């Protein structure tokens, strides 16, 4: 019997087997911790955390550290606390659509350097500040559509987003968009701007020229982009405007115009002097007449 056991092959040094068991247990504990940290009312699987359609009023705490895809869509979330994404450096997709967000805290994406897709549509955002996407240089897609109170986009709101390909600003409250906000987006392919109350005055001309120059690379929803003002172009498609539409913005004065203005100014000056002279004479006469009446009464 002893000889039989002696002839059996030994699987290896005891310390190697112990190390193998240790690593397996450690991996199991780590996996168990990641699964155990799934928030209540959420489902967690394959680095995807789905907390959508749960009527949440606040963001869930303590997500799995390796979360790559986080959906908080279709809830009633009104605010995201500062530093909420600090620990989730693997985050690639963040879906916050259809909530009650009015603003986002500064530096929210400071540590989300791998974030590529961000959906903030169907919220109540009123403006996009300069520091909103700071450090989130990996963003490829941003959806800000259907924010009816969105009135202003800071000229440097998208600064540094060199990889951004898709930007949706449709169906908001934008009447004006600074050209500077788009010029720093070399990779932009799709831009949606329809459904906004655009004021197609002189300030719109630079943006329209830029869009026309980029139209083969930047596909804008030209059929939905309409002017809400001034009255003479109200209801006109934005891309139907031509250089003639902005002719009044480039009026130049000729020599005859300057001579006419000078003549009118001269006439007005003479009329003013004559009027002052007549008023002076009238006042003097009234004074003398009043003084004469006083002497007669005495």
From Swiss-Prot:
GO biological process assignments: potassium ion transmembrane transport
Family matches, as InterPro entries: Cys-rich_flank_reg_C, KCNMA1_auxiliary, Leu-rich_rpt, Leu-rich_rpt_typical-subtyp, LRR_dom_sf, LRRNT
Repeat region (LRR), residues: 66-87, 90-111, 114-135, 138-160, 163-186
Topological relation to the membrane, as annotated: Single-pass membrane protein
SUPFAM superfamilies cross-referenced by the UniProt entry: L domain-like
Subcellular location as annotated: Cell membrane
Alphabetic keyword roster: Cell membrane, Disulfide bond, Ion channel, Ion transport, Leucine-rich repeat, Membrane, Repeat, Signal, Transmembrane, Transmembrane helix, Transport
PROSITE patterns: LRR (PS51450)
Signal peptide positions (record): 1-34
UniProt GO MF annotations: potassium channel activator activity; transmembrane transporter binding; voltage-gated potassium channel activity
LRRCT domain sequence ranges: 196-251
Residue stretches spanning the membrane: 259-279
Domain LRRNT span(s) in chain numbering: 35-65
Assigned GO CC terms: voltage-gated potassium channel complex
Family annotation (SMART domains): LRR_TYP, LRRCT, LRRNT
Major site of localization recorded for this protein: membrane
Intrachain disulfide bonds: 38-44, 42-51, 200-227, 202-249
Pfam families named in the record: LRR_8
Comment, domains: The transmembrane domain is necessary for interaction with KCNMA1.
Subunit note: Interacts with KCNMA1.
Function: Auxiliary protein of the large-conductance, voltage and calcium-activated potassium channel (BK alpha). Modulates gating properties by producing a marked shift in the BK channel's voltage dependence of activation in the hyperpolarizing direction, and in the absence of calcium.
Protein name according to UniProt: Leucine-rich repeat-containing protein 55
């Amino acid at each position: 019997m002893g000889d039989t056991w002696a002839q059996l092959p030994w699987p290896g040094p005891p310390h190697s087997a112990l190390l193998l068991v240790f690593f397996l247990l450690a991996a199991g504990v780590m996996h168990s911790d990641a699964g155990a940290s799934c928030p209540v009312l959420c489902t967690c699987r394959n680095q995807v955390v789905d907390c959508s359609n749960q009527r949440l009023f606040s963001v869930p705490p303590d997500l799995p550290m390796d979360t790559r895809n986080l959906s908080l869509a279709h809830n009633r979330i009104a605010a995201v606390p500062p530093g909420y994404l600090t620990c989730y450096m693997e985050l690639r997709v963040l879906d916050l659509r259809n909530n009650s967000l009015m603003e986002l805290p500064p530096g929210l994406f400071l540590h989300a350097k791998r974030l590529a897709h961000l959906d903030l549509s169907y919220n109540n955002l009123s403006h996009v500040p300069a520091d909103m996407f700071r450090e989130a240089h990996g963003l490829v897609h941003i959806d800000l559509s259907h924010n009816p109170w969105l009135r202003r986009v800071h000229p440097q709101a998208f600064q540094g987003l060199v990889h951004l390909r898709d930007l949706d600003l449709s169906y908001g409250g934008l009447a004006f968009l600074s050209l500077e906000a788009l010029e720093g987006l070399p990779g932009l392919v799709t831009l949606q701007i329809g459904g906004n109350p655009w004021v197609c005055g002189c300030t719109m001309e630079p943006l329209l020229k830029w869009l026309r120059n980029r139209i083969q690379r930047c596909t804008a929803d030209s059929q939905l982009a309409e002017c809400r003002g001034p009255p003479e172009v109200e209801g006109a498609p934005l891309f139907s405007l031509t250089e003639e539409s902005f002719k009044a913005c480039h009026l130049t004065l000729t020599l005859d115009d300057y001579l006419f203005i000078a003549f009118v100014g001269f006439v007005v000056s003479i009329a003013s002097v004559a009027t002052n002279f007549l008023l002076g004479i009238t006042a003097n006469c009234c004074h003398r007449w009043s003084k004469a009446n006083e002497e007669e009464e005495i």
